[in-house]
Amino acid sequence: MNTIVFNKLSGAVLFEDGGASERERGGRPYSGVLDSPHARPEVGIADGPPLKDNLGLRHRRTGARQNGGKVRHKRQALQDMARPLKQWLYKHRDNPYPTKTEKILLALGPQMTLVQVSNWFANARRRLKNTVRQPDLSWALRIKLYNKYVQGNAERLSVSSDDSCSEGGENPPRTHMNEGGYNTPVHHPVIKSENSVIKAGVRPESRASEDYVAPPKYKSSLLNRYLNDSLRHVMATNTTMMGKTRQRNHSGSFSSNEFEEELVSPSSSETEGNFVYRTDTLENGFNKGDSAANRKGPSKDDTYWKEINAAMALTNLAQGKDKLQGTTSCIIQKSSHIAEVKTVKVPLVQHF
């Protein structure tokens, strides 16, 4: 009995001995647990001041970003407000002194006051004088040289959207075309009108090309008509020419100038002079022949002039039936523009 009790007691004692470490561990104050080297990484409680510093840094960075965005937006707004004033300064660079009416009109666009516009132009003229210090320079040259002399982050007199590229005022229309913002609605009608002019100019160019092709055809038709009329005129004046040659007592020949006065020259150029006349003989008279173009070979020219001489001889035969011996004329071609009519005697057959 005692043994059992002892065992039980010993067991209890043993039980108490086994849990003593736990009781001792649980009985220790929390400061000891916190001071132990193994417990600190497990708990991981950060100190108070570094956490506050980190939060302050984050807040400062966020505020700096917001402030930077505000500054950038404000700078862009000021540039947009000053852009129409810069454009006016470029346009009137010979005399950059706007009148009161012009200042009022300039103030309406960027929603500025009259005093702000006046101050901006006064400051701009002052900057031009202080930056370009060369004496006896006109305002136009100062504005042109301003961007070359300006240094640092000073405001430049460019009218681009970001005011970063330096424009010397040589091509202000190009800067107007590249800008955006305030001046975009102003230039849209100009661009649309230019596009409409370009679109409208496509058809006139095609018409011009058609007209360029058409005149040779029209000219050739006129030339053919002129040649036909001249042929009729030549055939009509043969009788008068033969009468004049008879009145001159068979003088042999008359000069090319007289021939050109009496016969209208069918052409005034070498290309038109290549058109020649061809007449065909019929039983009752002569009919109008087509013009043979570009007769250049010597054999064709000989044949042509033989036909002309035969036609002249037949004309004289028809007109001089009552005479035994008459005269006729043969045309001798010396060049493309000069021709000579030579009168020769041709025996005629008497009709009974």
Swiss-Prot record:
Residues 19-53, 157-194, 245-272 are annotated as: Disordered. Keywords: Developmental protein, DNA-binding, Homeobox, Nucleus. It is found in: Nucleus. One of its GO terms (biological process) is muscle organ development. GO terms for molecular function: DNA-binding transcription factor activity, RNA polymerase II-specific; RNA polymerase II cis-regulatory region sequence-specific DNA binding. Residues 71-132 bind DNA. One of its GO terms (cellular component) is nucleus. Belongs to the TALE/IRO homeobox family. May act as a morphogenetic regulator of cell adhesion. This is Homeobox protein Mohawk. It comes from Pongo abelii. The lineage of its organism: Eukaryota, Metazoa, Chordata, Craniata, Vertebrata. The gene is MKX.
